[in-house]
Amino acid sequence: MQFIEIVEKLKKGQSGVVDFKIKNNPVILTAASLENAKDNDISFLDNNSPLNLRNLIETSKASALLLPANDTYIIEIAKKISVDWIILKEPKIAFAETLEFLYPSNVESEGIHKSAVIGQNVKIGLGVSIGANAYIGDNTEIGAGTIIHAGVVLYRNVRIGSKNLIHANSVIHSGSKLGDKCVINANAVIGGEGFGFVPTSNGWKKMPQVGIVILKNKVEVGSGSTIDRPSVGETIIGEDTKIDNLVQIGHGVTTGKGCAMAAQVGIAGGAQIGDGVILAGQVGISNRVKIGDGVIASSKTGIVSNIEAGTVVSGFPAIPNKLWLRCSANFKKLPEIAKAIRQLDRKKSR
């Protein structure tokens, strides 16, 4: 792809092209970091990049650069170098869009592989691809343009919207509903049984889990993640929510739109998550907790009670992040503080 083609495509995107220079109009074949780029590569510098990366634009071997509009230092250097460039309001978004141009998703050929098993009364939309050894249960519906890779299992009565991408060996249980443009990565399980057992004098009594899971439009679920169905009712994942690998979402959880959850997050049953909530790696949330819109929880935070909207929390149990930082700074001083207190006690007892 020639550089001018990338320029024209980015003009139509979301990155905000401010200016560009086309001198050599190189053919761009791949993308790379500034330090590793070579001929026919395109690279980028993000807003607020550290000085050591900013200085690399003078020595990088990339054939083209995506540069931030808010950095006057970079813009001055760009005017002096011979490399073609684009100046943008959001260079990271531009780089993401450029990767999409250069590395289009591998699209399976339309149609149903001969080894796939298709149940009764299954409705399959136009342009659907179903890979080898996939299993589609009775009364399931699959929307137009959806791609189902090898080994996927859709139980009966599943509803899949249009343009979804379901990767190999994922399992979607009975009654689950996916909106449009969802991505389910390999080995994820949607709608598995919630963890429901009742203690009795004779041991544990299993609580049947007959509810369903609903994923709204543009939800992405990482490899090995699980979203459980409840005993009754629904587990709901809001539109445009992004879930990393190895995340566990319990029965009856609801999330708002635009949430993000990093690896090994665990959310217990019945928790209610607002819009735009960000959960860093290994965050744990107790059952039935309510978390307001825009909450951010740093890594390993343990949330055991409700959190107000817009709060940034850390630690276990979760406390405001600034307080946690102060506590953490003092933690290593505790031996000295304890020693001082003992000395005061001895003086007092004399």
From Swiss-Prot:
| Biological process annotations from GO | lipid A biosynthetic process
**The protein's annotated pathway:** Bacterial outer membrane biogenesis; LPS lipid A biosynthesis
Gene3D superfamilies reported in the protein's UniProt record: Hexapeptide repeat proteins, MurE/MurF, N-terminal domain
> Membrane spanning segments where?
none
Q: Where is the active site?
A: H251
Q: What is its EC number?
A: 2.3.1.191
One matching Pfam family, short form?
Answer: LpxD
Got a GO cellular component term for this one? carboxysome
Enzyme class name? transferase
Q: Which UniProt keywords apply?
A: Acyltransferase, Lipid A biosynthesis, Lipid biosynthesis, Lipid metabolism, Repeat, Transferase
Q: Please give the SUPFAM superfamilies that the UniProt record associates with this protein.
A: Trimeric LpxA-like enzymes
Substrates-to-products reaction catalysed: a UDP-3-O-[(3R)-3-hydroxyacyl]-alpha-D-glucosamine + a (3R)-hydroxyacyl-[ACP] = a UDP-2-N,3-O-bis[(3R)-3-hydroxyacyl]-alpha-D-glucosamine + holo-[ACP] + H(+)
Q: Does the keyword DNA damage apply?
A: no
Q: List GO molecular-function terms, semicolon-separated.
A: N-acyltransferase activity; structural constituent of carboxysome shell
Superkingdom, natural source = Bacteria
Q: Which PANTHER family match?
A: UDP-3-O-ACYLGLUCOSAMINE N-ACYLTRANSFERASE, UDP-3-O-ACYLGLUCOSAMINE N-ACYLTRANSFERASE 1, MITOCHONDRIAL-RELATED
Record's family? Belongs to the transferase hexapeptide repeat family. LpxD subfamily.
Query: What does this gene product do?
Result: Catalyzes the N-acylation of UDP-3-O-acylglucosamine using 3-hydroxyacyl-ACP as the acyl donor. Is involved in the biosynthesis of lipid A, a phosphorylated glycolipid that anchors the lipopolysaccharide to the outer membrane of the cell.
Subunit comment for this entry? Homotrimer.
Protein name (database record): UDP-3-O-acylglucosamine N-acyltransferase
The protein's organism comes out as Prochlorococcus marinus (strain NATL2A)
Q: Which gene encodes it?
A: lpxD
